[in-house]
Amino acid sequence: MDSYSPLDTGQSAFTGWTRTHWEAVADSLLTAARRFSSPRHAKVGFPSAGPSGSAAQEATDQLEGFARTFLLAALRLAGNQGDQPGGRTAGPRSAGGYAVGIVDWYSLALDAGTAPDSDERWPALMDHGQPTVEATAIVLGLHFSRPWLWNALPQRVRDNIATWLGGSRGSYGADNNHVMFSATIQAFLAATGYPHNAFEIEAALARIEDWYVGDGWYSDGAGRRFDHYNAWTFQLYPFVILDLLRGNLHSASESEGRRRLYRSRLADFVQGYQHLFGADGSPLLQGRSLTYRWGVVAPFWMAQLEGITTVSPGRTRRLASGVLRHFLDRGAAADGVLSLGWHGSHASILQSYNAPGSPHWASKGFLGLLLPADHPAWTAAEEPLPVEMGNTSVVLAGPRWHVCGSMADGVVRALNFGSDGHPQRDDGLYRRLAYSTATVPVLEPGLDGGLLRDNDIYLKAGNGTSRHRGLRGGVARYDGGSSTFALDAGGRDVVANYATTVLDEDADRQRPGSRSEGVRIEVRIARLTGVIGCEPVLSGYAISSDMPVETAVWAERPAMNEAAASPAAARVTGWRRTAPGGLPARLASAVALYRTDLTDAAPERTVHRAVAVHGQCRAGSGTALGEHSALPQLEFGPLPANTVHIAWLVCLGAEADTLARTAVDLALCWTDDGAQLQWRGTSRVLPWQRETPWAADALNQDVFRWH
């Protein structure tokens, strides 16, 4: 993408990108969308690798392709204050090569999509339907570009649009972030003088309060479903709704009071969320809808639009441009078309609702174009990310994550003590012990017949493996955290008490006052109850690489009930994808057993072995991060005891000899409440989680409407 404009390393020392680059990317994406547009532009049928669906599904998919790219066009138009270089019909030819300007192109599309007799008419808005989601994208676009597009439409077209949008009134939707969709539509109808339901708006804003957990974070519906929807939904739509209702429905004091509340939450959110991005621009690979990619930067732009400087303007642009470049430099938008995947096409991170146009929710990441060109977010010198300034350790109390980054490799890890996801599904995108900006969760058969299941504690029992039944409690602390969860081992209930703390391996070598750049070592402990006859497996981070992954295993039979002098250990090493011309970035993942203690059985009856399971997630495709994948894990034979205490070390980014060096200086003993740890003159406790307020196997997601 650098071909659009020379890099500006003076103003943008980290990314070289300026507003000009962002505009060029937007024009490239919009030009590509036009190639797949219907004759009157109301449908965009991006190519699909899968089989064709029903006619109704195809119509919805094409609406999605239109709506999400229309949002980008509206942001481009508004960011240019309605000015189309070359005149109304020429469009920004110098950047995007448009044959028809944005206003003319989309005026025709809006007419064709809503006229009753049009053969390009969009699907009706009905209960729990995808068209309502896409209608919200259209509403966002109409709102942002209102002075130049909506206001210029013939009254007939505005009436048709309002009639189509009115179909959402009184309808059911998913009881999660989707409650914001109908509310936003109703707010737009209110703002433009059409029939609407004010109570639906109020009900949606009231509903999301049920899910607010602090630090600016919301659960995506009932339970503990934390993910990037906080960034591109919960920290976006409330502000849009308030803007639409300015002078409607709410008194000035009420609107300002709500805005202060949402601003406070947004400030808290971006303060913590900025720590979830690696130095290479990668967001944390956790949660669903990862194919929306740079949509994750929307709240940083929204903060600037709202005058919130918790994250400085210079860091905002460095972060946002870094994320955008991360994906574009790795092939996410070949020929201007966003693929279904992460860097490129890859089905492993997709959900059933993803269609060819889905990735274009990334358009929300272009909110920064609404800022004037002379805004500090576009003119200030780029400032480094937190992980570029030293090792970081941050507690996000809302989702209950301990976030730690290492300056040496620029990788950020999120240790999970609160995200749980779907209650009835063992979803790796939500229920792993840890996530990172350089690894992706895996749950796939290995090439040797084993299982690739990263960052987990699970049990082999009978002919299968255990299923997570959900978190019962958890807390993130300044140096780690604790959680309690249940496992279903072939119908048997197993309770797992888990805790971890993070050590800086090289921290003691730092000069006084210097920034730590040391390797981050996780000391993990677990107490498993109800495991007689089961075979525990403890896995580390999965490494993905486009080159074959190296594996190594050491010391398969350590001593029991004491720290092993030569612990069982396993390591895998691969190479991260880098920008074109960059050298491959080496990345290793290692685990090492520190000690195991059994209750009510002779220790010599337990067998241990360390195994690096090497395999691809899917034949020929690997993971979203590489063609090959592997993870290190510790496997136990059948346990002769009903309770086992295990302590092990985990590291991402270092070789196994680092773990051995850490273990030499480590002393750990068990207590009824957890474990006591001493390491190089420091003392820590790793407490078990005492309170278990969360219900395992909660009800599935419900539907919502105000009635």
State the predicted function of each range.
Residues 1-64, 101-109:
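Low-complexity, Ser/Thr/Pro/Gly-enriched N-terminal "stalk/linker" regions
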Residues 62-63, 67, 71-80, 99-301:
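Aromatic-lined, polymer-binding surfaces characteristic
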Residues 81, 85, 150, 249, ...:
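Structured alpha-helical bundle/scaffold domains in large eukaryotic membrane-trafficking regulators
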Residues 117-122, 254-255, 278-423:
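Carbohydrate-active enzyme catalytic cores, enriched for enzymes
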Residues 207, 321, 542-545:
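Amphipathic alpha-helical scaffolding segments
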Residues 386-387, 391-476, 481:
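Low-complexity, glycine/alanine/valine/leucine- and proline-rich hydrophobic stretches
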